Amino acid sequence: MPLRHLLKQMPIAEWIMAADLAQRTNLDQRTLDHHVHALIKDGVAIGCCKRRGYYLSEAVDFVDQGELINMLKASPLLRSERLEVLDEVDSTNTRLLTWPELSGFHGRACVTEFQTAGRGRHGKRWHGARYRNIMLSLAWQWSRSSDLVTGLSLSVGLAVARVLSQWAGPGLQLKWPNDIMFSEGKLAGILV
């Protein structure tokens, strides 16, 4: 069962009894409890109490595939049919690298709500909170030598920071070489 469905059935700042939530989601209470505690572990703000049930402490902002597709209609670089939106995946990067048609690799994007094995720089594991981060990978093939893309991570970071600063306002910074920071937290990381 997608966890998104479970969260959509859970009210914001209002208790729902576990039995009622289990019925809404067609889950037994043990499975429901397991899913809720996994969501809490992954950073979703859920209140829980044995006698009162559960509630969302704040609204959850889901990735809207339809909205992304509409936005991509105007894009000359990425076509909507090359976009894949998943609730959960091991790694968006791995997903793209294992795409069956390598000839169709260029210009493909994978967006997810959660990665179980996200990758950071130097092969380090990267973990983002479920439903709080934009986790995506974009496949782009270069016709030039790989040594010409040395500064690409920094260039992409600057471009992303420039766009995000329109919404974020003051306080947005680029931390060498590939992290975009805001209010003392990491807003984005660029991995090339």
Sequence positions of predicted segments:
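N-terminal lobe of the biotin/lipoate ligase/transferase fold
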Residues: 2-166, 188
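Glycine- and Gly-Pro-enriched alpha-helical subdomains that act as flexible
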Residues: 174-182, 186, 191
